[in-house]
Swiss-Prot record:
Residues 137-242 form the C-type lectin domain. It is a single-pass type II membrane protein. This is C-type lectin domain family 2 member D3. InterPro entries: C-type_lectin-like, C-type_lectin-like/link_sf, C-type_lectin/matrix_domain, CTDL_fold, NKR-like_CTLD. Lectin-type cell surface receptor. Residues 1-78 are cytoplasmic.
């Protein structure tokens, strides 16, 4: 039998052996240190690193891996800015309040001074004076009538002027009335119910008998003899009114 016939008739085991040998030869060739092997190794390494989780790569870096330094600085800057803004608001506000308080104090002081000045000016611009046609003496004003009437009418006339029939409280006032009246007899405010009763003024205060009163009449008058005399109520005479001086304001 020829050699080719022997090869064709070889059992399947030999064919499997040849195929295995060829695979081992191919594997040895692919595992050699050529360029293709190096590239494959590098690709595998890159793929491995890219698949490692980010948190594991940064593991062990502590606070910096959670709060990076740039973020901490940013928070510090924010805090500084807020502090500066707060100071910029509070300081001017405090200054403004202080200025307003000073202004209010100044206004209050000025108002008080103005009130005091006004009060002083009011006092300085007032004076005691008597009405027109009245004569001033001491702290009183006197009116000497130019007409005549009975004692009752004379009393009512003086009351209508806010006064009373003349009253003297000192001898100096009496002497003034005597000099000023001239030679005529004038009704004054003395009266009594009868010769058995005391003399009184129109306000019913009792006369102090500074000067004795002559006559037996019920009403007193200043006589032309510079004395005080009495007469009947119906006799007509001129009269004298008296009242205290009042302070009046003087216009500027």
């Amino acid at each position: 039998m020829s050699s080719s016939a022997h090869l064709q008739d070889a059992p399947p085991l030999l064919s499997g052996t040849l195929t295995q040998n060829e695979g081992q030869t191919s594997l040895r060739q692919s595992s050699s240190c050529g360029p293709s092997a190096a590239s494959a190794s590098e690709s595998l390494s890159g793929y491995t690193e890219s698949r490692i989780p980010h948190s594991k790569v940064r593991q062990g870096k502590g606070l910096r891996s959670i709060f990076p330094e740039s973020r901490v600085k940013r928070y510090c800057c924010y805090g500084g800015v807020i502090t500066v803004v707060a100071i910029a608001i509070v300081v001017p506000l405090s200054v403004t309040l202080s200025v307003k308080q000073m202004e209010q104090t100044s206004i209050n002081n000025t108002s008080a001074a103005s009130i005091n000045n006004t009060s002083a000016a009011s006092i300085n611009n007032t004076s005691a004076a008597c009405p027109s046609n009245w004569t001033e003496y001491g702290n009183k004003c006197f009116y000497f009538s130019e007409y005549t009437s009975n004692w009752t009418f004379s009393k009512d006339f003086c009351a209508a002027q806010g006064a009373e029939l003349a009253r003297f409280d000192t001898e100096e006032e009496l002497n003034f009335l005597k000099r000023y009246k001239g030679s005529s007899g004038y009704w004054i405010g003395l009266h009594r119910e009868s010769s058995e009763h005391p003399w009184k003024w129109t306000d019913n205060t009792q006369y102090n008998n500074l000067i004795p009163i002559r006559g037996d009449g019920q009403c007193g008058f200043l006589s032309d003899q510079l004395n005080i005399s009495s007469s009947r109520v119906y006799v007509e005479r001129p009269w004298i009114c008296s009242k205290p001086k009042k302070y009046i304001s003087q216009s500027q």
